[in-house]
Amino acid sequence: MIQGIDYAAIAPPLIVVLAAIALLLADAFDVPRRVLGAVSGGALAAALIAVVALASGGRRATFCLPGGLRGNGPASCSYVADDFTLLFQGVVLAAAVVVVLLSLREIADARMPAGEYHFLLLAAITGALVLVAARDLILLVVALETLSLPVFALVALRRYDGVASEAAVKLFLVSVVSAAIMLFGISMVYGATGAMHLDRIAPALQRLPDHLSPVAGVGVVLVLAGFAFKVAAVPFHFWAPDVYQGAPLPVAAFLSVVSKAAGFAGLTIVLALGFPAYGHVWGPVVAVLAAVTMTLGNLLALRQRTAIRLLAWSSIAQSGYMLAPLAVGPRRLPEAVAATIAYVALYAVMNLGAFAVVIGYGARGKRFAALDDFRGLARTRPAAGAALAFFLICLAGLPPGVMGLFAKVVVFRATVAGGVTWLAVVMAVNTVIGLYYYLAWAARLFAAPAERPSAPVLAEPGPAVRAAVAATAAGALVLTVAPQLVLQAVTAAS
C-alpha cells in the first residue's frame, strides 16, 4: 500500500508545474510578455527557496512501498528529497533562472509565442527536478521524457525557420531511439531482478543466478546507453552541434547546462544506487565512452569557426571529463560520484556564463556569430570581454580560472585513485588540446577590432541579459576564490 503524498518533499517541482499551467492559461488572455517572463522567473525563484527550506530539514521521501515480505522492512520510495537531490535541484533551478533572463529578449526578437515558450520551458524544468529525485526506473523514464518532450517543441518554436525545424526533427528521432533502447534495457533488468526500485534492484543483482546474469548485464549497458544520449556522450552525441545551432540560443544554453546536469544526476543515481554490483560491466564501458567523448569533442572543436558550434563540441568534450571518474566502477564509487557532481556544478556556471555573453553580445543581425565577430570585444566592451575571457579560461582549466582547474584536478585525482590511470593520461592530453581553442577565442577578444567594411556590429544587450552575465560572472568569481565549497557540499550530499 502506497503512503500519502508528502507535498513538502515535492514542493519544488510542484511549484514549477503549477506555474507552467498558469502561464499557459494566462497566454489565452493576451497577457504581456514581460508579465509572463516575470511569473516564470518568480516561480523558479520560489522553487529555489523551497529547496533551501528543505535543505534545512532532514531527508524526506514520498510515493513509498513497504519493504519485506510482510511489509515490515524498510520502505522503498520512488521520490526522495535528500541532500543529493536538493543539491542538484538547486543547480537546475539557479541555471534555469539565468536561462529565463536570457530568453526574454530572444522571445521578442524571434517573435516566438511567449506563453508557449515559458510553459514548455517550465515543463522541461519540472522533468529535470523530478529526474534528480527519482529512485525507481519507471519514474526515471517518465521524468526523462518529461524533460525531453518539451525541448523538441522549444527547438522548433521559431516558426518558419527551416534550420530550427530540421534540428527539432533530428533531436526527436535520436531521442525516440535512445528512449526505446533505455526501455528495452529496463525491461531486461526488471525481468532479471523482478524489481523497479533502485534499492531493491541492487541486492537482487548481487544474488542473481548465473543464467540471468548475462540478461541483467545487457540491460545495464542499454540503460547506460540511454543516459549517454542525454549527456551527449560519443557515439550518442551527433545531435548536439546541429541542435545547438538550430535552436534559439537560450534553449541551446538550457540543453548544454540544465539538461546535461539532470542527465548526469540520473546516470549517477542509477549506477551508484541500482547497479553497483555490475560495476565490472559498466565501468569499462564508461571508461571507453569518456575517452572517446573527450577526444572527439576536443578534436572537432579545433575546427569550428562559429561560437555556438565551438561551445557545442566543447560541451561534448566536457561530458567526457564528467564521465571519467565513474569509470572506476565499484572501486571508490562515492569519491567518483562526488567528483563528477562537483564538475557538473562548476561547469554549469562556466558554460552558462559563456552562453550568456554570446547571446548578449553576438553580432547584430547574424544568426550564427563567428569567433571573429568577437574580435576586440574586450576593447569596445571591457566588462563583457573580460567576463567571456574568464569563462573560457575556466573551461580550459587554466589559472586564473581556478574553478576550472580545481574541477579538472578533482576529476583527475578520482580517476587515478580508482586505478584507471590510462584514462587519466587521456584526460591530461585532451586538456592540453582544449587549451588551444579556448585560448585562441580568448585572444581574439583582446585583439584590435576588425576594420573591414563588413565588420559586424555587436548587439547591445538588455538589462535581463546584463543581469544574467553579471550573475554568472559573480558566481564564477566566488567559486574561483573558494572552489572547495562545492566539493565539500557534494561530498556531504553523496
Label for each model-derived stretch:
Residues 1-494:
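Alpha-helical transmembrane segments of multi-pass membrane proteins predominantly involved
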